[in-house]
Amino acid sequence: HNGRAITPTRLTPDAVPFSMYFNLDKPLIGFWLLLVCPWIAPRFSWRVSLRATAMGLALAAIAALGGAMLLGMVAWAPKWPHQGTLWLLNNLLLVTLVEEALFRGYIQGGLSRKLKLLPYGQTVALVVASVLFGLAHAPAGWQWMLLAGLAGIGYGLAYRFGGLSAAIATHFGLNVLHLVFFTYPMLTP
């Protein structure tokens, strides 16, 4: 079993209890991909990556957080939980880096390389990676699957125009916005 880092806690009175584990098995996949497939992390200037991050984060936030509010999944709830620093480290290193290495770097990047001669190959690669990312969130319910797929489009655009670091920053940025400004993880049904 993975170690529990945060015991079930309500971050706001209207939220479902949140708990967090240090899932150390999943990161092995991401780190392995970074070592074995260096092509998943194309190089972009920091300015280009920063612009791609801003664009991707704006789109992902409007689609995913706006969609979550429309679906009644979250509400405005600004806060800084006392577990915030631990959450930040876990989310950056063991969640977003790993998920983006797999979904954007390996899947979207790999498909982009294979489909580069097709007129819409880059778009197909982005959509396929986003759909698969959404499906990976299916255990949380159709709403989170839909919202993750929409967020995945923002992450995919950041990857396409700014590389893996932009996709990681976009994903991490959206997760931080969710934690700090909205009900986390979701409203109690």
Predicted regions and their residues:
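Transmembrane helix-loop-helix hairpins at the membrane interface
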Residues: 58-189
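Juxtamembrane helix-loop-helix connectors linking adjacent transmembrane helices
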Residues: 2-95, 113
